[in-house]
Amino acid sequence: MWALCSLLRSAAGRTMSQGRTISQAPARRERPRKDPLRHLRTREKRGPSGCSGGPNTVYLQVVAAGSRDSGAALYVFSEFNRYLFNCGEGVQRLMQEHKLKVVRLDNIFLTRMHWSNVGGLSGMILTLKETGLPKCVLSGPPQLEKYLEAIKIFSGPLKGIELAVRPHSAPEYEDETMTVYQIPIHSEQRRGRHQPWQSPERPLSRLSPERSSDSESNENEPHLPHGVSQRRGVRDSSLVVAFICKLHLKRGNFLVLKAKEMGLPVGTAAIAPIIAAVKDGKSITHEGREILAEELCTPPDPGAAFVVVECPDESFIQPICENATFQRYQGKADAPVALVVHMAPESVLVDSRYQQWMERFGPDTQHLVLNENCASVHNLRSHKIQTQLNLIHPDIFPLLTSFPCKKEGPTLSVPMVQGECLLKYQLRPRREWQRDAIITCNPEEFIVEALQLPNFQQSVQEYRRSVQDVPAPAEKRSQYPEIIFLGTGSAIPMKIRNVSATLVNISPDTSLLLDCGEGTFGQLCRHYGDQVDRVLGTLAAVFVSHLHADHHTGLLNILLQREQALASLGKPLHPLLVVAPSQLKAWLQQYHNQCQEVLHHISMIPAKCLQEGAEISSPAVERLISSLLRTCDLEEFQTCLVRHCKHAFGCALVHTSGWKVVYSGDTMPCEALVRMGKDATLLIHEATLEDGLEEEAVEKTHSTTSQAISVGMRMNAEFIMLNHFSQRYAKVPLFSPNFNEKVGVAFDHMKVCFGDFPTMPKLIPPLKALFAGDIEEMEERREKRELRQVRAALLSGELAGGLEDGEPQQKRAHTEEPQAKKVRAQ
């Protein structure tokens, strides 16, 4: 295999050196055009909505049950359509883990323009785009259109998917499964006041990238890309949108055996018009005898309704109770409501007015509650892998926690169920609760499974013997700084690795975040449990390396949750220092203008101002930098441009006690980073891809594992932690011979201190035993890939040229600045 790898490196080296010059930027491989999705072709064959009758199977399923770390989200399934109600941070990760496929998700309904409801929407849209979905329609508050414009600041123009906004004032929406009615509800503070966005009904508004923006802009204002408006919009938190969903009538099923008994021509072409007639409720005449439709068909299902309503606080209770549309569905309604989904805190549920409103739906209506009283575990795979890693080293891999249930819910006279992750309510074919898919987190099962793996127990015992006689140097025994890896995957959140975020606890009362991808707050909750407010209270700064979604879309939730945490701790709110590319301000400004006030939460330091030799013309920025260094007890906070997208930075933190932590962000091997990080105590470097994928790493402007290790060795770093792995390496990356006593592998929720450095390389044997099956699969994939490359090289004649040249030549590093990535890398 070594000879095969050498030949492949030789062929690859010749191909790259002959095919490009140093001055050329790495070319991007064209993606093959996606075929139309199968379900879209099927939909075309079915014809217009409702022509073939309603679906046979419809159910609602809880994606996120309302806990503080997961929010509230609901998935609705029929064989014709898929729907999502709310899309907060982490929803995409939960759907991926629990196999709730997003490929057919062409309708998303949002109850409120609040980050808890839309925090995961940008990532979900990017994923839908990559699946080849041609169109997605979003329904909800009026600011939704501006929000979708704003995310183009970091996502690009979103070509390839048509996004349409259905305003809450639009008429009902109808498709093959159901009719949806939107009900705008204003809190008591806004009732009776003119609502400027309540315009006459208008058709769907497409978000065209070509939409013009203001032609003039102040150079001091954040730069907004073409197509993003600079105008301040209507920002209103007093509006929620409820949804009433009415299933279409489902015609009865034709009784084949009964038809045979009656002598009907079953199995012939003549039976088709008979089936069509009786399903439409018409009688037929056969051999002089009239046969009623009910003799040959089961009764039709007229189609139940379900309601999704959010009541954020007590100011919305009276408007909900008095809403005329709801009243038409209460009591003796023509269309009985089978289920009401309440996204409401306990303070609302205990209010007698709200309880009476619930009772008016009648005793046959079920009620599902999604709120903070949920005690359900959502991220099962994360708990499982952490429990198993904890067997190797309990301190480095601490067990995860979950939020305790705050208190027992109110006792109501209506049938009420507290939401749990994956709980189902089936509307068709039979109305019933289904609990078989609900997650149960059983740590004992996880432990038994790990202990039964070949060589695992033996390797753990050998590891413990090897480290018990290797004490850390005296100067490294301090608990601080403490590094908590919260997200170690790239591109999109997945079931085991979340996207980029690393918490650096500088001292017991001071910490900072290195990047802040979607779901970072949820990771903090699972790591710290009910101590999360204390941790947020210590947060002094956030460094955002660049504007790809997997590195910054968790920031807003951190800001909002930090405000709540400081209030609970009795501390005043003060702005959080954010070191980031100045382009981040444009996104925050747009969200602030259109959706929710957030700018008072931050004081921004442009990352370029912390580069070596940078001139700082603003006294305000100088004061912020001084505050950053003083608060974090740092001698220096330095940044440098790295080789990734435009405006991508790495950083180096130098503490007054002498230690130095360097963070690469996303980058190819970068000399500027090597210089900045000289003699680092710890280098945290991305290692997105395995060795052998150097060409793909150049395409995507990332590093391989050996390239990352090489950077650390040239930097003379005391220790190197590899991070930001492609999600194809879900559990563990492929280890290479370049792994040495200075190299460790990061996992989500891993806790590392400098005193752990001697221990880290010794973790590799038990890790290999724990993940032996996964490593074997990855090695098989690598061997197949290498064989394909050999065949391709033989066909092109490159292999023969490589053999004639003798020694394999090292792949030449590219020194040019890579082209900007538009969305994200795998």
Swiss-Prot record:
UniProt xrefs under CDD domains: RNaseZ_ELAC1_ELAC2-C-term-like_MBL-fold (cd07718), RNaseZ_ELAC2-N-term-like_MBL-fold (cd16296)
EC number: 3.1.26.11
Keyword Acetylation: no
Cofactors that this protein relies on: Zn(2+)
Biased composition (Polar residues): 15-24
Keyword field contains Metal-binding: yes
GO BP of this protein: mitochondrial tRNA 3'-end processing
Gene Ontology CC annotations of this record: mitochondrial nucleoid; mitochondrion; nucleus
A Pfam family this chain is assigned to: Lactamase_B_2
Residue ranges, compositional bias (Basic and acidic residues): 27-38, 208-224, 808-820
Domain of life: Eukaryota
Sequence segments annotated as region (Disordered): 15-51, 189-231, 798-826
Molecular-function annotations in GO: 3'-tRNA processing endoribonuclease activity; metal ion binding
Chain positions with Phosphoserine modification: 199, 208, 212, 229, 618, 736
Gene3D superfamilies per record: Ribonuclease Z/Hydroxyacylglutathione hydrolase-like (3.60.15.10)
Keywords, comma-separated and alphabetical: Endonuclease, Hydrolase, Metal-binding, Mitochondrion, Mitochondrion nucleoid, Nuclease, Nucleus, Phosphoprotein, Transit peptide, tRNA processing, Zinc
Subcellular compartments: Mitochondrion; Mitochondrion matrix, Mitochondrion nucleoid; Nucleus
Reactions mediated catalytically: Endonucleolytic cleavage of RNA, removing extra 3' nucleotides from tRNA precursor, generating 3' termini of tRNAs. A 3'-hydroxy group is left at the tRNA terminus and a 5'-phosphoryl group is left at the trailer molecule
Subunit structure: Homodimer. Interacts with PTCD1.
Role noted for this protein: Zinc phosphodiesterase, which displays mitochondrial tRNA 3'-processing endonuclease activity. Involved in tRNA maturation, by removing a 3'-trailer from precursor tRNA. Associates with mitochondrial DNA complexes at the nucleoids to initiate RNA processing and ribosome assembly.
Family affiliation: Belongs to the RNase Z family.
Name of the protein described by the UniProt record: Zinc phosphodiesterase ELAC protein 2
Species whose genome carries this gene: Gorilla gorilla gorilla
Upper taxonomic lineage: Eukaryota, Metazoa, Chordata, Craniata, Vertebrata
